[in-house]
Amino acid sequence: MASMALRRLASRNLVSGGIFRPLSVSRSFNTNAQMGRVDHDHELDDRSNRAPISRRGDFPASFFSDVFDPFRATRSVGQLMNLMDQLMENPFMAASRGSGRAMRRGWDVREDEEALELKVDMPGLAKEDVKVSVEDNTLIIKSEAEKETEEEEQRRRYSSRIELTPNLYKIDGIKAEMKNGVLKVTVPKIKEEEKKDVFQVMVD
């Protein structure tokens, strides 16, 4: 009886040591693998969640369209300058358009203490096709030439409106020049001595 009890006890120890232990190891391995997958998926989720936020923060949805058509809506001079700053701060824009060379914007705007200067590429247009005017402190640039096909008409029609800060620019001193398909508009600024913020009133 004692020998049979010892054999049963030994058999139980073998079962617990030989069968359940590998199962325990197997469960531990599967758990680690599952946790590894969860961590990996979580990392992917984090990257996927972070990427759109970063892109939205650095580049608004209209950014790429603004680069090539900044005048599709009425804009202020400040908005144009901010757009230029964005382009200068992000030189990889050319690569994002599939070109290794510097991206040609087709437009440029500069401002200093003397004047505001705007350049716009208008290939295929002559100075007779371009009209520049100012209405209610808004600089209006329009161009349209006679075309033979509808495709050309769409490509060679241009219209823009730029709001000018009141009492800052000399409206009657604006100059426009069309040369080699490039329109250059210069808007001089009012000098301090020319400003008429103070009026002397004669006392009778």
UniProtKB/Swiss-Prot annotation:
GO cellular component assignments: chloroplast stroma
Pfam families named in the record: HSP20
Protein's UniProt keywords contain Acyltransferase: no
Ranges that cross the membrane: none
Principal location listed in the UniProt entry: plastid
Domain of life: Eukaryota
Localization per Swiss-Prot or TrEMBL: Plastid, Chloroplast stroma
Gene3D superfamilies: 2.60.40.790
Biased segments, Basic and acidic residues type: 37-49
SUPFAM superfamilies for this protein: HSP20-like chaperones (SSF49764)
Keyword Plastid: yes
Alphabetical keyword list: Chloroplast, Plastid, Stress response, Transit peptide
InterPro entries xrefs: A-crystallin/Hsp20_dom, HSP14.7/HSP23.5/HSP23.6-like, HSP20-like_chaperone
CDD domains: ACD_sHsps-like
Region span, Disordered: 34-55
Domain sHSP: 98-204
Family named by the database record: Belongs to the small heat shock protein (HSP20) family.
Annotated PANTHER family: 23.5 KDA HEAT SHOCK PROTEIN, MITOCHONDRIAL, SMALL HEAT SHOCK PROTEIN HSPF
Protein's recorded name: Small heat shock protein, chloroplastic
